[in-house]
C-alpha cells in the first residue's frame, strides 16, 4: 500500500502553513510577522512590495499551533472534497481570491494585522454546502450552514469583544466568498 498525495492544493497549503509556523517558532522568529501577516489600516504602505505580498500570504501565517490545527482540521476535511469536485487549480484560485479580499478589506477597515486561514475555512464550509446545487434551487444545507455559522459570527462580531472582531470579519467575508463561488462556479464536468 502506498501513500497518495491526493489533494495537491490543500496538502501543499497545509504543509506550507506548518512550515511557516515551524520556522517562525525556531530559526526565523519574525517570519510570520514580516511576510505572513497583512498590516491593518494605517500600516499598509503601497510602496512596500512586502505589504502587497502579504495580501495573499497572510492565510499561511498562524499565531500558534492551536490556531493552525483549528483551521486545518476543517481544511483537510473539506478541502479534498472540494478539490475533487472543482479541481486543484480552481480551489487554489478560490483560496487566493479569499486571501486577497480578506486582506484588502482588513487594510481598509481594521487597525490590527490579520493572519490565519479562518476566512478560507469559512469559504470552504459554505462552498461545500453547495455540492448538490442545481439551477433554480437553493440547498437547505446551505441555508442551515449560513444561519448557524455566519449567524454566529455576526452575533459575536457585534458583541463587546472587540479583540476578536477581525477574525469574525474574516469568517464572514470568507463565508460570503464561498457562497458566491457556490452560486457561480460550476463543478468539473457539469453544466447549468
What are these regions, as identified by a protein language model?
Residues 1-192:
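A detector for small-residue-rich transmembrane helices and their helix-helix packing motifs
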Amino acid at each position: 500500500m502506498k501513500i497518495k498525495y491526493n489533494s495537491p492544493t490543500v496538502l501543499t497549503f497545509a504543509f506550507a502553513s506548518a512550515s511557516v509556523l515551524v520556522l517562525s517558532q525556531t530559526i526565523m522568529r519574525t517570519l510570520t510577522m514580516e511576510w505572513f501577516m497583512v498590516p491593518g489600516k494605517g500600516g499598509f504602505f503601497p510602496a512596500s512590495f512586502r505589504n502587497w505580498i502579504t495580501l495573499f500570504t497572510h492565510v499561511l501565517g498562524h499565531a500558534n499551533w492551536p490556531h493552525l490545527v483549528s483551521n486545518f482540521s476543517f481544511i483537510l476535511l473539506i478541502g479534498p472534497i472540494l478539490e475533487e469536485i472543482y479541481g486543484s487549480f480552481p480551489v487554489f484560485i478560490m483560496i487566493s481570491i479569499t486571501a486577497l479580499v480578506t486582506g484588502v478589506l482588513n487594510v481598509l477597515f481594521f487597525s490590527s494585522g490579520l493572519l490565519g486561514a479562518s476566512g478560507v475555512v469559512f469559504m470552504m464550509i459554505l462552498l461545500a454546502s453547495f455540492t448538490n446545487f442545481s439551477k433554480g434551487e437553493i440547498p437547505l444545507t446551505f441555508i442551515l450552514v449560513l444561519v448557524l455559522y455566519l449567524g454566529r459570527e455576526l452575533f459575536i462580531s457585534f458583541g463587546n469583544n472587540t479583540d476578536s472582531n477581525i477574525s469574525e470579519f474574516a469568517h464572514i467575508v470568507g463565508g460570503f466568498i464561498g457562497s458566491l463561488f457556490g452560486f457561480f462556479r460550476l463543478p468539473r464536468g457539469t453544466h447549468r
